[in-house]
Amino acid sequence: MRLILVRHGETLWNEQHKFQGISDIELSPKGMSQAKKLAESLKEEALAKIYTSPLIRARQTAEQIARYHDCQVIIVEDLKELNQGRLEGLTVEELHRDFPDFLKNWIHNTESAQLPEGESLGELQSRAWAAILRMKEEHPKDTVAAVAHSFVNLTILCRILEIPLQQFRKLRQEAAAKSLIEFTEKGTILRGLNDTCHLSRI
């Protein structure tokens, strides 16, 4: 399987540096432009299916990709972003002010630290990777796209690169970025990471 792993376009909360999590925030005008450019960059791909998180910012991005392809858009609950609980809607400054104990735990126990009334990264990785394996089983020889979120994609990439979640901060997933992963009989290959060349004119 060739997997094109996509992050959704930008939202107003992204621009305001707020934690989104599972809050259902639409693409901003800039984010919609990014999604359209991303879709154009994928129009020559022979996509068997487009999978997407149920959150609207991902679905809007997937719908733009689908304009160029005669294939289904499938909603996958396990591609939903990390449930960030009480952190959702906060800025980084508010996080540091209101949840200093959580931050200390997050830094030292990144995989297992439970977000206040939310998930841990380990829990997210388990469900997101299970979704990828289901795609691989259904499409062993196909190219598919999966539209998800920053933390979702980062945990998938950590699994592919066989690095601990503690190291996720060394990776980036920009708005409307795409990464290319190939699953072969000999192993998994990361062919492209966080590609945003298609956004150069926005």
Predicted regions and their residues:
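Extreme N-terminal starter segment of soluble prokaryotic enzymes
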Residues: 1-4, 49
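Generic beta-sheet signal
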Residues: 3, 142-150
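Loop-to-helix element that buttresses phosphate recognition and phosphoryl-transfer chemistry
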Residues: 10-64, 68, 115-129
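Short active-site segment of divalent metal-dependent hydrolases/proteases
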Residues: 11, 152-153
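Short, basic/glycine-rich phosphate-binding loops at helix/coil junctions
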Residues: 15-18, 101-115
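Phosphate-coordination/substrate-recognition cap region in phosphate-metabolizing enzymes
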Residues: 39-103
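Acidic, low-complexity terminal tails and accessory targeting/binding regions
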Residues: 71, 75, 82-96, 137, ...
